[in-house]
């Protein structure tokens, strides 16, 4: 869980920007979206192989 304390004389926009940065760096939102719905193991394997294929093609060019 990301925690951000608003500093003295800091605007709310700046604090929100810092919070968003910490959340994105920790990968919390990405993990939530990944686990939002159940994926069958066969679907996980298929997505994993497709991602590997995309990385391989990207590396080749």
From Swiss-Prot:
One of its GO terms (biological process) is translation. The keyword Ribonucleoprotein applies. GO terms for molecular function: structural constituent of ribosome. It comes from the Bacteria. Pfam families: Ribosomal_S21 (PF01165). PROSITE patterns: RIBOSOMAL_S21. Keywords: Ribonucleoprotein, Ribosomal protein. The keyword Ribosomal protein applies. InterPro entries: Ribosomal_bS21, Ribosomal_bS21_CS, Ribosomal_bS21_sf. GO terms for cellular component: ribonucleoprotein complex; ribosome. Belongs to the bacterial ribosomal protein bS21 family. PANTHER family: MITOCHONDRIAL 28S RIBOSOMAL PROTEIN S21 (PTHR21109), SMALL RIBOSOMAL SUBUNIT PROTEIN BS21 (PTHR21109:SF22). This is Small ribosomal subunit protein bS21. It comes from Pediococcus pentosaceus (strain ATCC 25745 / CCUG 21536 / LMG 10740 / 183-1w).
